[in-house]
Amino acid sequence: MSSAAPRTPTLLILDGSFGEGCVALLHLDGAAAGRFESAPELRPHQPLVARAAALLPDASSRSQIVAVLVGVGPGSYTGLRAAASLAAGVAAALNIPVIQVPSDRALLLARDASGQTDPVVLPLGVREVLVVDAAGSRIAERSGAPAGADLERIAPHLPAALASTAAEAIDLLRVHEWRTESGREASEIAIRYPAPPRGAEGGVAR
């Protein structure tokens, strides 16, 4: 009888701050920066959960996951909530920690990696956009928003940018051999809204 394949520590990366969102795996299999695997978008507007299921089709693949890395905004209200909900569910089911990453910082890194310099402009609704640049994140009217970087060129670089932003937390977990008290952190995901959702109180993300 052959022995089981050795476990490869893997992070599930989620972000819903813009567009179709980001679903990827980071396999920490000895390579200096790890090996990324992105979920294909099998059809337009496919939910994050379906794309995650495509990356993790069976118990064996899910058993490799040692933590969930989730972008917590600011960005699309609906997308951020979807990513946070999925991250919390996976972490609770597998009893693993959640690493929370500011989406705007990662978006700027991904923009730079794509060779662009324009601000990142994310649609928030019919009239508003979120402008992300070196000065921070702010709400602007669509009609007065600056020209934005090409989001399609940014998207392929986002998994690596999210992981880079979380490098210190990832290294700390690695030192402790991916062991934490539990996955209870999943219930404490704090979404950074750029402005209060309609009908709610809150502030501008800094």
Whereabouts are the PLM-identified features?
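Oxyanion-binding and handling regions
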Residues: 1-32, 41-50, 99-206
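Phosphate/pyrophosphate-binding betaalpha-module
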Residues: 37
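Short, well-ordered alpha-helices that flank and scaffold nucleotide-derived cofactor binding pockets
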Residues: 54, 88, 92, 113, ...
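Phosphate/pyrophosphate-binding loops at sites that engage ATP/ADP/AMP, CoA/4′-phosphopantetheine
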Residues: 52-67
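DPxDG-like acidic metal-binding loop motif
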Residues: 68-97
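Alpha-helical transmembrane segments of multi-pass membrane proteins
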Residues: 67-68, 106
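N-terminal, well-ordered alpha-helical segments
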Residues: 46, 50-53, 84, 88
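Phosphate-handling active-site elements
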Residues: 59-63, 91-102
